[in-house]
Regions:
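PLP-dependent class I/II
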Residues: 3-500
Length: 500
């Protein structure tokens, strides 16, 4: 439909008094706000909304020729690598293009393995609410390889519309009893990405924060888990423990020892373990490697390997794929009570299946080109380039941030973000309060206004009270990361001077 012209007027116009009366009646009779779910009303307003609104205005002003100290915005709030200079993987885009437009398979310009994969995928589009049957098998084979032979079973895997949808809609919907008193609780890391916190609240549950130890590289301490659990007494009934490994926004990568401690804690306290592992491709720290919770659980042996209930998540949006728009992911269930698993699959089955193109992208993630395939040399070259680029970005970012006065950045061992602490001057904190903002939101708004760089404030992520942080994406091209750091250095120096 074409948009209405700006001069459009309705054919029948009501007198202004009648309009006012009608509007008043709609408010009083319908009581819209009173009818909205209290769980939805309890969702904390995002700090990012202030920044997003202003960024939208700035983009409009730039397009209208308004003069500013910069020509365009640089949005490094989110992990969307293809929007910040990282090229998509050729193999992935070629196969998806051939699936969408099969005529391309008649062209010999596409490598043979691309055409064969597209043909194979198109021949298996039979649907199914838990995903294409073959896709669950492919994911199962992938996790078995990844975990050093720890067996995986297709019947314990379902395909989802992204990892966040799977965690918050499919899994927590089963775990959370919205009518319980006290309400259901979920232990969540702090800092933690805001979508998880909002979703937990929307379901009528309580997020119980456990604070990662920033001074020790954002490590997860079992003593802190115990403190968080005790703090929930009389407030809620914790049933699940949510972990993010590698971290977001904090860039920790858990060691085997740390994961074993978490598993023992979950076992002792009878907590359902939710492992968000979407950044498993991105590990940079020395002597660090990604090991899945499923693998560590299996290696611990009985009784843990037989009893701890675990759900793990992965996504095509993250890692080398970076296909954020596909919204494809998977969930693997381990040791679930058959009665619980039945309800999870019942909930999934009531929904339409994940978009077929997203499922195809998932196949390309878990089953990439192998040595000897025509597409392998280029695929290997591109993924290696991304690895090297990110390693350099991490090194450069760490050096620059820690050279700035009043900034401390812990080493980034994995994930897609850097989350430095900013020690803001008292005058800046006072000014932020006068303007009705959190101090680090105020900092980010000023950064946006003066440099065109869009970062997220730490207050978006449940940081420890009295501390201030910013988060920005490092899964960008080296040129963009350097540009962000250049702007940030200039801005921060001036900001600290202005408010000293």
């Amino acid at each position: 439909l074409s948009p209405m012209p700006s001069t459009y007027t309705p054919r029948v116009q009501l007198p202004s008094a009648q309009i006012a009366s009608t509007q008043l009646r709609e408010v009083t009779d319908m009581s819209v706000l009173q009818e909205i779910s209290p769980n939805v009303k309890n969702i904390k307003q995002s700090e990012y909304e202030v920044l997003a609104s202003r960024a939208s205005q700035i983009e409009k002003e730039l397009s209208q020729g308004v003069r500013k100290p910069y020509k365009e915005l640089i949005d490094v709030c989110w992990c969307d690598p293809h929007s910040v200079g990282v090229k998509p993987l050729t193999f992935v885009r070629q196969v998806l293009a051939a699936c969408v437009y099969p005529q391309l398979m008649k062209s010999h310009e596409l490598p043979l393995d691309v055409r064969q994969r597209a043909q194979w995928l198109l021949g298996r589009c039979d649907g199914g609410s838990v995903g294409m049957g073959c896709m669950c098998v492919k994911v199962s084979e992938f996790t078995t390889r990844r975990d050093g032979g720890v067996p995986s079973y297709p019947e314990n895997i379902f395909i989802s519309t992204g990892s966040q949808w799977a965690i918050m809609v499919d899994i927590l919907n089963v775990l959370v009893n919205s009518e319980a008193s006290p309400k259901t609780g979920v232990l969540t890391p702090a800092p933690c990405h805001v979508t998880s916190m909002m979703s937990i609240t929307a379901l009528g549950a309580a997020a119980v924060p456990y604070y990662l130890t920033e001074e020790q590289g954002w490590t997860l301490q079992v003593e802190e888990l115990q403190r968080a659990l005790e703090s929930a007494k009389g407030v809620c009934n914790p049933v699940a423990l949510y972990v993010i490994n590698p971290g977001n926004p904090a860039g920790l990568v858990q060691s085997r020892k740390s994961m074993q401690e978490v598993i023992r804690f979950a076992s002792e306290k009878r907590l359902f373990l939710l492992a968000d592992e979407v950044y498993q491709d991105f590990v940079y720290g020395e002597n660090r490697e990604f090991v899945s919770y499923k693998r560590v659980l299996a290696e611990m042996g009985p009784p843990y390997s037989d009893t701890v209930e675990l759900v793990s998540f992965h996504s095509t949006s993250k890692g080398f794929m970076g296909e954020c728009g596909m919204r494809g992911g998977y969930v693997e269930l381990v040791n679930l009570d058959p009665a619980v698993q039945k309800h999870i699959f019942k909930l999934i089955s009531k929904s339409s299946c994940t978009p077929v193109l997203a499922q195809m992208a998932l196949d390309l993630m878990v089953n990439p080109p192998q040595p000897g395939d025509p597409s392998y040399p280029l695929y290997n070259q591109q993924t290696q380039h991304i690895k090297n680029m990110l390693a350099q970005n991490v090194k450069t970012t760490h050096e620059v941030l820690n050279s700035l006065p009043g900034v401390i950045s812990q080493p980034v061992e994995g994930g897609a973000f850097v989350f430095p602490r900013v020690f803001l001057p008292p005058k800046a904190i006072q000014k932020a309060e006068e303007e009705g903002m959190q101090p680090d939101t105020f900092y980010c708004v000023r950064l946006l206004e003066e440099t065109g760089v869009l970062c997220c404030p730490g207050s978006e992520f449940e940081q420890k009270e009295g501390t201030y942080h910013i988060r920005f994406c490092i899964t960008a091209s080296q040129d963009i990361v350097k540009e962000v750091l250049r702007h940030l250095t200039t801005f921060h120096t001036k900001f600290m001077k202005d408010f000293s």
